[in-house]
Amino acid sequence: MAERDFIIVSGLSGSGKSTVLQALEDQGYYCVDNLPATLLVDFGAQLARRDASSMLAAVSIDVRNREFLAALPQALADLRQRYALCPRILFLEADEGTLLRRFSETRRRHPLTDDLAAALGESLLTVLRREREMVQPLADVADKRLDTSQINTHQLRLRVQAWSLASRHYSGLVLLLQSFAFKKGLPLDSDFVFDLRALPNPHYDPELRALTGRDAPVRDFLEKSPEVARSFVSLRTFLQTWLAPFAQEHRNYVTVSLGCTGGQHRSVYMVEALARLLAGEGQRVLIQHRELGITETLT
């Protein structure tokens, strides 16, 4: 089956554009980093001349490319009119505290920290705010905005995988099921969040404390509980009821987050159990156990 997708990756400096481009490249995309805006239409022309049955491409553009925002509307119009190409725009962002920390850790200069900024005595925070104002028009027209403040590199790659899969050869809804610890914060990109902290906690059994919800002894412990069984049935019914309407509304993917205290036992077990059931029914499922650093794809 034909695979066609063209993605423009942009956003704030330090938000993860390089990671996204690497993730897309690993999925078979032909990627170009920091493509000049004046070459976007020429790049589209090259894509249009390739085999029509296979076209996966992505380009990243940031504020180093200062003429891009002014040129983008006309470039997109030319791509549509001349080559029937409609790129999707993925815009990455993060909060100021996260961006400041990332620049401090990597010791890299911000692209806007030029001689003029130095002459004006601008701080990094001021430069970040100036950049946010510059790229806001692009954020407003993006097909997908992704906040990377509370996700690591591995988690970002998974988000990109889910988003890019959704409009390619797999035409159905992609479901991302993720476990997490409430004590470490809610996943920001959740469509639905379910609290499993009322279920029996294997943590209080010394023999189970070091294990996870993927281990047989923990599964056996939880499956003996009527509360766990009822919760599983309720969640299964909810997902089976609402996934189809989401797909009919042309949603690309849905993120369902299941949390417990430590993100190790109950939420991990429930994600695994629901994923096995739904994948067996033909649903495309991505699993992420945030606190365990585990990701998997089930088909």
UniProtKB/Swiss-Prot annotation:
Keywords: ATP-binding, GTP-binding, Nucleotide-binding. It comes from the Bacteria. One of its GO terms (molecular function) is GTP binding. InterPro entries: P-loop_NTPase (IPR027417), RapZ-like (IPR005337), RapZ-like_N (IPR053930), RapZ_C (IPR053931). Pfam families: PapZ_C, RapZ-like_N. The keyword Ribonucleoprotein does not apply. Signal peptide: none annotated. GTP binds at D62, V63, R64, N65. Gene3D superfamilies: P-loop containing nucleotide triphosphate hydrolases. The keyword GTP-binding applies. ATP binds at G11, L12, S13, G14, S15, G16, K17, S18. Displays ATPase and GTPase activities. Belongs to the RapZ-like family. This is Nucleotide-binding protein AFE_3021. It comes from Acidithiobacillus ferrooxidans (strain ATCC 23270 / DSM 14882 / CIP 104768 / NCIMB 8455) (Ferrobacillus ferrooxidans (strain ATCC 23270)).
